[in-house]
Amino acid sequence: MASIEKQTGELQEKLIAVNRVSKTVKGGRIMSFTALTVVGDGNGRVGFGYGKAREVPAAIQKAMEKARRNMITVALNEGTLQHPIKGSHTGSRVFMQPASEGTGIIAGGAMRAVLEVAGVRNVLSKAYGSTNPINVVRATIDALANMKSPEMVAAKRGKTVDEILG
């Protein structure tokens, strides 16, 4: 598992995994590489990309471009989550809950990289089922995308934020 961090302007880029894959043809095997990356601004915007090419740098570059194109905005609450959330993709399931200041990012592998570039500073999380990095990243992004801020909930219910928060 490779992990490379790079700053581009205001975006943080992280390489999560590089994998060698092969295609079998009549004349033998054709080797190529895949790269899984996440990009975020550290302030609630995050995206992931998956690139494939004959050379590692080209695969990483493709993955970074896809990640920049597929960014979502996450409503954070002072460096943590709004409420406990669950996400899933194929065999991977993730559970994340807000944590108090000073807790840090308690997450493993691919999930940690996504949370770091998204700007989450305090969170408790657990991955269940498959720990395949691609599926864990997709499940984490799914959970973050489905998180609702109190303002969004209040608008849907036609109430004020104070009524929602109690």
UniProtKB/Swiss-Prot annotation:
The answer to keyword Metal-binding applying to this record is: no
Matching entries from SUPFAM superfamilies are given as: dsRNA-binding domain-like, Ribosomal protein S5 domain 2-like
Any idea where the S5 DRBM domain is?
11-74
For this UniProt record, give its keywords in alphabetical order, as a comma-separated list. Ribonucleoprotein, Ribosomal protein, RNA-binding, rRNA-binding
The signal peptide annotation in the UniProt record is none
| One GO cellular component term noted in the UniProt record for this chain | small ribosomal subunit
One GO-annotated biological process of the protein: translation
Report the PROSITE patterns cross-referenced here.
RIBOSOMAL_S5, S5_DSRBD
Going by the entry's taxonomy, the superkingdom of the source organism is recorded as Bacteria
Task: Give GO terms: molecular function aspect only.
Answer: rRNA binding; structural constituent of ribosome
Report the InterPro entries cross-referenced here: Ribosomal_Su5_D2-typ_SF (IPR020568), Ribosomal_uS5 (IPR000851), Ribosomal_uS5_bac-type (IPR005712), Ribosomal_uS5_C (IPR005324), Ribosomal_uS5_N (IPR013810), Ribosomal_uS5_N_CS (IPR018192), Ribsml_uS5_D2-typ_fold_subgr (IPR014721)
Which comment does the entry carry about domains? The N-terminal domain interacts with the head of the 30S subunit; the C-terminal domain interacts with the body and contacts protein S4. The interaction surface between S4 and S5 is involved in control of translational fidelity.
Describe its function.
Answer: With S4 and S12 plays an important role in translational accuracy.
Q: How does it assemble?
A: Part of the 30S ribosomal subunit. Contacts proteins S4 and S8.
Per the record, the similarity remark reads: Belongs to the universal ribosomal protein uS5 family.
Could you tell me what this protein is called?
Small ribosomal subunit protein uS5
Name the gene behind this protein: rpsE
